Amino acid sequence: MTLWVLGLNHQTAPVDLRERAAFAGDALPRALESLRALPQVSEAALLSTCNRTELYAMADEARSLVNWLETHAPGLSGYLYQHQEAEAVRHLFRVATGLDSMVLGEPQILGQVKDAWAVARAHGALGSGLDRLFQQTFSVAKRARTDTRVGANPVSVASTAVRLAQESFARLNESTVLLIGAGETIELAAKHLSEGRVRRLLIANRTLAHAQTLASQHGGYALPLTDLERHLAEADVVFSATAAREPLVTRVQVEQALRARKRKPMLLFDLAVPRDIEASVDELSDAYLYTVDDLERAVEDNRRGRREAADQAEAIIDLQVARYVETLQATTRQAPLKRLRAFGDSTRDELLAKARQQLHNGKPTDEVLEQLAHALTNRLLHPPTAALRDAALNNDLELTTAADRLFPEKPGYQHPPIATPIVRTDDADPAP
C-alpha cells in the first residue's frame, strides 16, 4: 500500500467548487465508510475546512481515489493536487503547521487536522500507517510553532474580516453587528469585535444555547436562527460562518433589509464554505459582500511579513520528513526479518510439541530426534527451495545471487565486504 494525499484548496479551486467538495456533519462518517469499502483502500482520513478538502489514504493506486472524489463532486479532477509517500508526509506537516493556509501560520488548522484524525479513528478508518503519520504530524507542528515565530500573533480570516469592517466603518463602535453561527470562526470574530467595541452585537445560531453562551462572553444578544430575517435590517455589518448546506441569507432578504434601512450601506462577510450568503447579494447597490476568497488578497501583506519564520519552519519540516521516511524504511526493511523469525519460531514450537508427545507415548528417543531434525530441515528449507527453483526457471539473477551470499558453498565461509573502487589521480604512477 502507498500513502496518498489528494485535495484541493483556496489556491487551486474557486469557492463554488470547494463548496461542492466539502464534507459537513453526518456526510463525513458516511464518506469514510464509503472509502473504506473500496478494495484498493486500507486506511483513510478526510480533512474538510472552508479552504480545503483533502483525502489521505493508504491505497494501491490513486485512480480509484480520484474516481471516488469525482463521484462526490463531479468536475473537480482538474483542480486536484496529488502527492505520495514522502511528499504526502511533507504536505500534511506543512498543512498542520499553517504553512499552506490562506493566513500563514493560522492556528485553527492544527485543531482541524486533529478533528479529522479523531473522526477517522472513531469510525474505524485508520490503521497503524495513518495513525502513526498523524501522531507525528502533531509533534512536528507543535515543534515548528514553538521553535519559530510562524504562529506568533497570527492573523486569522476572522480577524482580517473584522479589520476590514473597522476600515470600512470609521465608527464601528456606533454600529450594530450581526454574527451568524457559533463555531470557532464566529468565536474569533466575536472576540476581536468585543475588543474593539461595537454598539450592539447580535448572535444568531440554530442552537440558541450556543448563541447565548457566546453572547454572555462578549456582551451580545442571542437570537434563534428563525429570527434572522426579522433582525437583518438592524445590522450594519454581518459575519456568517455556519456549516449549512444551503445559503441562510438570500438576495431577497438583503434587498428587503436595505429598503428598511433606507439604503444605508450594509457590509457582509461570508466566511463559510459552502457559502452562507447568496453570491448575487454582491450585485445589490449598498450591499458589499466579501467571501473567503476575497479575504486572501487582504492577508497577503501578513503572509510576506511572516515569510522568514515560515522558512525556518520549512527547514524543521524538511528534517522531520527525512527522519520519518528513514524510520518507515527501517521498519519496512525489518518486516521480512520479523516474518522469517516468526516462521522459524512457530515451526520449531509446532514440531517440538509433536516430538514431546511422541516421547511421552514411549517412542525411542533417537527415532524421535531423527524425525524432528528431518521435519525441521524440510519445513524450514521448503519456502526458499521453492523460491530458488522458480528463480532458476525464470532466470531471476537477483534472487539467485542473493542466495549465493546467504548460503555459501563452504560452511562457515564469510563473504568479504564489497570493496570500494580505487580512484586513480592524474599524477598516479601507471600500472606496470
Swiss-Prot record:
The active site is at C50 (nucleophile). CDD domains: NAD_bind_Glutamyl_tRNA_reduct (cd05213). The keyword Oxidoreductase applies. Possesses an unusual extended V-shaped dimeric structure with each monomer consisting of three distinct domains arranged along a curved 'spinal' alpha-helix. The N-terminal catalytic domain specifically recognizes the glutamate moiety of the substrate. The second domain is the NADPH-binding domain, and the third C-terminal domain is responsible for dimerization. During catalysis, the active site Cys acts as a nucleophile attacking the alpha-carbonyl group of tRNA-bound glutamate with the formation of a thioester intermediate between enzyme and glutamate, and the concomitant release of tRNA(Glu). The thioester intermediate is finally reduced by direct hydride transfer from NADPH, to form the product GSA. This is Glutamyl-tRNA reductase. The record marks H91 as: Important for activity. It comes from Xanthomonas oryzae pv. oryzae (strain KACC10331 / KXO85).
